Amino acid sequence: WKKFAGLRALYGYTMAHPGKKLLFMGGEFGHFIEWKYDDQLDWFLLLYENHPQVQQCCKRLNEIYRTTPALYQIDDSWDGFQWIQANDSDNSIVAFLRTDKRGNSLLCVTNFTPVFHPQYRIGLPQMGTLTECFNTDRKEYGGSNQYNNWAIRTEEEQLQDFQYSCDICVPPLATVYFTSVSYTHLRAHET
């Protein structure tokens, strides 16, 4: 399970990371053999359960990329990217924000170890509510189905360089995306 989970986590991390995307043919379904220009792909792999699940994960990642401007706008400057967690070598978890031209953000959290973190504390630059919008550990992608199925409110509790923080569920060998709504935005719609 670790091989496919690690691959899905890597694809999720790569899709959210700044820069243009490249995936050689066959990678979208977990092809084992390096790409060969003079031979066809091993399509029979799609008969096995794990390969179509990786394919579904890649399909969903492509849909998210096409419909989430934060993943492709401001792709060439620090204005569209902010490290949230880059120093947790004990847990091998990294997190960053991608922001579009309108200020909408997507939080990407990747766990590069097979250790489940049901309550991982993460610092954030603003007060708001996080909602999980993608998780490579979902059952339909071949994962263990550990996910955040509730809205997560940040608290005014400092963590590292951030004034706010919250606890999130971080599955093993997985990448999770969150969208956020700031409290000021929520208040504007409540009145």
Task: Give the residues covered by each predicted segment.
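Active-site rim elements
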Residues: 1-2, 42-52, 162-167
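Carbohydrate-binding surface patches
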Residues: 85-124, 174-179
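Conserved small/polar residues in nucleotide/adenosyl-binding loops
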Residues: 184-191
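Short Gly/Pro-enriched turn/cap motifs at secondary-structure boundaries
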Residues: 2-5, 14, 84-87, 166-168
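Glycan-recognition and catalytic regions of carbohydrate-active enzymes
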Residues: 9-10, 16-19, 23-26, 30-106
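C-terminal beta-strand-rich structural cap/linker in extracellular carbohydrate-active enzymes
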Residues: 151-183
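C-terminal accessory region downstream of the catalytic core in glycan-modifying enzymes
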Residues: 41, 46-54, 61-63, 121-152
